[in-house]
Amino acid sequence: MKGIVSWAVVSAALVLSATESLAFANVSSFEKRTTTGNGWDLDGKSYDYVIVGGGTAGLVLANRLSANQGTTVAVIEAGNSGYDDNDKFVVPDANLYNSAVNTQYDWQFHTSSQKHMNNRRASWPRGKVLGGSSAVNGLYYVRPSETEVNVWSKLAGGSGRWSWNSLLSGMKKSEHFRGPVKSVQNQLQIQYNAGSHGSNGPIGTTWPAVTYDPVERFIKTADSMSGAINNDPYNGNNHGTYVALSSIDKTNWQRSFSRNGYLDPISKRSNLHVLTGHTVTGIIFDRSGKNAQATGVHYAASSNEASHTVHANKEVIISGGAINSPQILQLSGIGDKNLLNGLGIDVVVDLPGVGENLQDHVSAGMSFKPKNKKDAGPTSVTGDAKADSYVNSAVSYTSLGKLFNNKDSILGKIQARAKQIADSHNVSPAVKQGQSKAYNALADTIFPSKVSPVEILGNVMFGSISIQAALQHPLSRGSIKITSKDPFAYPKINPNYFAENLDLVLLREGFKLIREMSQQSPLKDVIDFETVPGDKVQTNEDWENWIRSAAGTEYHPSSTCAMLPRGDGGVVDENLKVYGTSNLRVVDASVTPIAMSCHLESVVYGLAEVAADIILGN
């Protein structure tokens, strides 16, 4: 992860562990423990709902759908449970100082060679454990803006089911918010609106129990440059500067994530069974009716292990995330018929949008040597719960007008290019039509608004002060495509970074703003000098060359099973049902038709809560 490892490790400590194995005789006589690693425990059994993926969204669904004791639910997760290595997940700063990137605990995905990033292959770590990426991310809890969520709703069909008010309700349902400790509140001058938050949900949110001087200086400097402190960024306007919440449970200062929030409290439900360490290799369909009916799934521990089958009485729900969900659909015969036919896969539903529309927050970080070591934050896990609760969370979501002296000029370029981009893509006519509508919405609604095109993040860690910039609404579009029938072979991941040069221009201006911040008081008073990229980078060309060599993922891929009308290349409808099927849904970040200007955890929790209500008919 050259060029980004110093700051990206904050959200990429991927750790797995062994899990207990318990035998289950049948669905009606569960053991008291719901989690097993033995594939035979589900083999041949039938459940009302089979959930593919025990990650951020999957465990929300497992909890809500199994609340009725008369409803049986099975979850199949490729990773292990993580219970034996619990501290690596629940200690917040363990994600900084005990990283498992590029180990067995990491999916170890990589992109294809990126033409516009010096042909580099970027590392794409993803959580492979119960809880998914909510178990291993940087703990940022940031919500999107009302403007972009309503654009999502309109693109999806306009029924209002996915309006801001609907998603906000789901996000609040998932949250139990607690205010900051007084010392941190006073130092960082934190103000908040408790009414914007949930108080009884499974996921704890609060601010870390300690903070560091550069965090305060970052906030004050950003405020002095823009005058945009936001004291209520969770109620539909996330623009401005603030210290974001972290997904931390204030009662014990531990990470709050989907496993310990949604699964552990219900671990004795006799109607819920969670299988870990097994990969779903394909969905089984009955194709005798008008629409294909999902009747179950095949799964296995590895390509060398026995294949098993579990049956679904009501529905199969895919919650594999932006990479694995389109992969599973394609392996099961749902996707672009040309791709599937070329691999010898029987076409169940010709849906050319599967795997298309991939969007990611591309980012990089600048680093600065602090004048005093004490200003560089922690360097290891201490064993003190409050001290170890510190994670980076200072952010500034800056508008187009703050990045460019002439906002109208850059906006005009974006709007002109938006009318042309889709036609340049080698995709089906339906996908092209949907992309064209999305581009027009970005150009005409999102970019002219206060919705931020670039996020600035202030970090202290590893003896350094670093500030990161991340593009929030990329114009470039990529794809996820399988390359073989082998379910254990990784798909081709092509985010197509900087295929649209305007993405590079937007991010470039973000870094120029960061340099300006570093040279302004009070932040400059704790900085000795800039170490990365250093003073050799001065011209626009210098900046762009450095970005191409240093940029990577901010770990927020989305939109590969887009919620759009089928005629616009959509994969799921507003009920999250896959087109051409009667009972197959996708519930995860892959369904958002456009990227959101936030860290995705809050969106996925809210989305899954809304999805559960839809499935249950609430």
Curated annotation (Swiss-Prot):
EC number, as in UniProt: 1.-.-.-
Active site: 556, 599
GO molecular function terms listed in the Swiss-Prot or TrEMBL record: flavin adenine dinucleotide binding; lipid binding; oxidoreductase activity, acting on CH-OH group of donors
Cofactor: FAD
Location relative to the cell: Secreted
Broad class of where this protein is predominantly found: secreted
Co-factor binding details: Binds 1 FAD per subunit.
InterPro entries: FAD/NAD-bd_sf (IPR036188), Glucose_Oxidase_domain_2 (IPR027424), GMC_OxRdtase (IPR012132), GMC_OxRdtase_N (IPR000172), GMC_OxRtase_C (IPR007867)
A GO term from the CC aspect: extracellular region
Subunit structure: Monomer.
Designated name of the protein: GMC oxidoreductase family protein Mala s 12.0101
Record organism: Malassezia sympodialis (Atopic eczema-associated yeast)
